[in-house]
Amino acid sequence: CANKGEGLQRWLQEQAILAALTLPRLEGESEEDWLSRVVSDSKETAKSAAERGTQIHGVIEAFYEGVYIPELPTYVRAVETAINEHFGSQLWVSEKSFARGGYGGKCDLIAKNCVIDFKTTEKDLDKLDYYFDHQMQLAAYRQGFEMPTARCAIVYVNALQNKAKLVEIPEDDLRIGWDCFTHLLAFYRAKNKL
């Protein structure tokens, strides 16, 4: 289990460095203007990645809702295979939400005693594991859905390679995630006088 915040920060830094390497300073351009262009370019890369992720999530959601998709992307079948091989055939419900206990959430995919969240990436799936934030997120979801013993997993989707990888979070890590989440929720409530 890694720290998601560190991974995201590293990715953002890498995007800024790549932008700096691929955007030469224009003749007569001040350093301030060049840096502004570099930052703008790296933000655009992050925005595009987020939009791709939203689009991929939407296609997977539509598939699990039974919407006819004339040209089903190959990565959707990779997701279906990964889930079915791990959890077996289930009646899945997508984008289910809850609000109770002072917090709420929306789960990408839920079945009887299973909670799944999709994460899109362009990285090599063999090198990916779940992050600590995922432990807390899914532990909070299963409690919010009143399924305290639900199995929880992250499904990484690489649409460029048409691959998916399911990583189930061990029960011990989910218990730790729930403990940490409840402490953070109590802190938030106290800080905000709720």
Regions found by a protein language model. Name each.
Residues 92-192:
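Mg2+/Mn2+-dependent nuclease catalytic core
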Residues 1-104:
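Metal-dependent nuclease catalytic cores that hydrolyze phosphodiester bonds in DNA/RNA
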